[in-house]
Amino acid sequence: MPQNEYIEAHIKKHGRRLDHDERKRKREAREGHRISKDAQNLTGFRAKMFAKKRYAEKVAMKKKIREHEQSKVNGTPKEHNPEDGDALPTYLLDRQQPNSAKALSSSIKQKRLEKADKFSVPLPKVRGISEEEMFKVLKSGKRRNKSWKRMITKHTFVGEGFTRRPVKLERIIRPSALRQKKANVTHPELGVTVHLPILGVKKNPQSPMYTQLGVLTRGTIIEVNVSELGLVTAGGKVVWGKYAQITNEPDRDGCVNAVLLV
């Protein structure tokens, strides 16, 4: 027997106390009071670890309850056969149809799948970009000892009416040479690639700040002007703007390639 199992060895050799079961029952009954006391009185690191442990226990408990309820829903009720001669009670008349709870659960799952499919993109995951790679520190001031300015090293979109702030107030600089106005957009169903103007940056997966700055990186969702494609809605109206996802690295290729989200 391993050396660390000396307690098990002692129990096998001498048995347990005569009041072991009673002491165990009382200890389990007091457990709730002990947990309540610790939750109210613990402070510092021990309180953090206690809260973390309790959170994990509650999550596991809720998961187990949800699985149990799901198994109840999935169980089909026994159908009533009117030929048996037993009259069905009034409160069970609406249960002759299939289980409504199961049908409702299935419809909700189907809607979730449709929603996920609707918003699915060609590139669901992209590589993270650090701030050191995104921004370059610019030295300013008479002695070049101030370093509060940053220059974006990636391609950006700034829009038509963009005006730079005064030099003394501009903290983040977007170079003119790295600004993009158009993108090579590919229609996945038609199989054509068109040079379309960019209307705006919808979402950059790296950070909300990069979305606000209009940074164009791989996986960014942009809005493009698709009026040249002649797309129309079911009501006969011309589609003006549509979303597309960037599939290349604009700072490496020097251009923006995107796939239209249809």
Swiss-Prot record:
Gene Ontology BP, a term: maturation of LSU-rRNA
InterPro entries: NSA2_fam, Ribosomal_Se8/biogenesis_NSA2
Motif (Nuclear localization signal 2): 51-58
Region Disordered, residue ranges: 1-39, 61-86
Subcellular localization: Nucleus, Nucleolus
Gene3D superfamilies: 2.40.10.310
Subunit (UniProt): Component of the pre-66S ribosomal particle. Interacts with NOP7 and RRP1. Interacts with RSA4 (via WD repeats).
Family affiliation: Belongs to the eukaryotic ribosomal protein eS8 family. Ribosome biogenesis protein NSA2 subfamily.
Protein function: Involved in the biogenesis of the 60S ribosomal subunit. May play a part in the quality control of pre-60S particles.
Name of this chain's protein: Ribosome biogenesis protein NSA2
Organism: Yarrowia lipolytica (strain CLIB 122 / E 150)
Gene: NSA2
